[in-house]
């Protein structure tokens, strides 16, 4: 055994390439929570409401000369009174929670073919835990059991979105 130390092996080949993405800031762009029936709903609600969730992701370049984008993950959660009879239409709205959660991101040397999936899949995947927490807290603070959003397949959402024409300015 000797007292000399061996230089560390070259691990450069084992290091994965850096993600060409920097999240500059995350923020609540818009938040709304409404109980249309007011206090009456707390006295008359007899069963767990039916909850519908709608999700959308938008991405827009903020400056033409810089690779800086705003990505917005929009969630609308609407709870309706359960139908009184099997197969009947749901009742009145119990609550409506809407959240538009934004992130300003910079892409550095991202290949052109990866820009769209990074913006519409990877960024929403990274900010989703914050969105999930906000929706849960808002519904709980509104006097209802917290709505815990289940994981979202952003790849499938992106692929479905690609099958429809896009409006100008969206990634």
UniProtKB/Swiss-Prot annotation:
GO terms for cellular component: cytoplasm. Its main location: cytoplasm. Gene3D superfamilies: SecB-like (3.10.420.10). This is Protein-export protein SecB. NCBIfam families: PRK05751.1-3, secB. One of its GO terms (molecular function) is unfolded protein binding. InterPro entries: SecB, SecB-like_sf. Belongs to the SecB family. It comes from Gluconacetobacter diazotrophicus (strain ATCC 49037 / DSM 5601 / CCUG 37298 / CIP 103539 / LMG 7603 / PAl5). It is found in: Cytoplasm.
């Amino acid at each position: 055994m000797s007292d000399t130390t061996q230089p560390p092996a070259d691990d450069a080949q084992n290091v994965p390439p850096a993600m060409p993405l920097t999240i500059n800031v995350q923020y609540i762009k818009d938040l709304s929570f409404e109980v249309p029936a007011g206090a009456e709903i707390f006295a008359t609600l007899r069963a767990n409401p039916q909850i519908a969730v709608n999700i959308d992701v938008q991405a827009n370049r903020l400056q033409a000369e810089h690779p800086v984008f705003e990505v917005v993950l929009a969630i609308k959660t609407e709870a309706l009174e359960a139908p009184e009879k099997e197969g009947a239409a749901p009742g009145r709205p119990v609550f409506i929670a809407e959240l538009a959660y934004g992130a300003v991101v910079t892409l550095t040397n991202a290949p052109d073919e990866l820009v769209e999936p990074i913006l519409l899949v990877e960024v929403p995947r990274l900010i989703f835990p914050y969105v999930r927490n906000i929706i849960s807290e808002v519904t709980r603070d509104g006097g209802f059991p917290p709505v815990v959003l289940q994981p979202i397949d952003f790849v499938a959402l992106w692929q479905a979105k690609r099958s429809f024409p896009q409006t100008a300015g969206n990634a």
